[in-house]
Amino acid sequence: MKLPATTQNRVRTTTIFCWIVVTITMSVHCSPPPPDEGGYIEQLLEDRENKDNFFSEGTDSPVPLDRRSWMLPVRYYEPNLTYRVPASLRISENQPIFEVPTSTGQFRTMQQVGTLEFMLNGEPLTLSALMELPASETTRLFVPFRDQTSGSETYPAGRYLDLDRTATGIYDLDFNRAYHPTCYYDEQYDCPFPPPENRLDAAVRAGERLPAENEQQFPMNTPALLKQEAGGDLPNN
């Protein structure tokens, strides 16, 4: 039976409308809104400047006075929105608890909250999201990682990301905010190493990086500890 022309038009209109609604709904739930590039970069640069000021002048700066001349200002990769991606947190069924070795030869107790799943430069990747124990509540996720720049362009032990918990399970994974642990500046700090599953087979050229090659100086105990922790697979620096 052939529908009248007006009915056919109504069906087409309804179908198109429904498709638009579904598409918009999926976009809203599957990814954060596109960033305001100008405002985002401006805020990022301001935060970097504030960190430099604190590291240079703050009474609680983790950078020893005799190292500030070559460690500061902190060196960064240029802001790059390619390295700001949405990630979905898949909650771990058992949320295992395990011990993580640290830069001082100690251990920290961590719990795997879940796995962050994301795409970076067209490649599917994952990172374990952790919480240090004991903790009264999980308000932030700790994401330590190493990548293909570790040991050459960035600190051999890796870098960190901190993420505020979300109700949706969708996270703004911004590697432009990846930072070096405090033990990079002073070996007296105790810093957990990234777990094996958080060693990315990709170069993350975003966030904090090492000073120029001829200025690289590491705390004396760092290379030996890293070599022991990583089974000898780290380059010498």
Positions of PLM-derived features:
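Extended, aromatic/histidine-rich regions of cofactor-dependent oxidoreductases associated
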Residues: 151-153, 170, 178-237
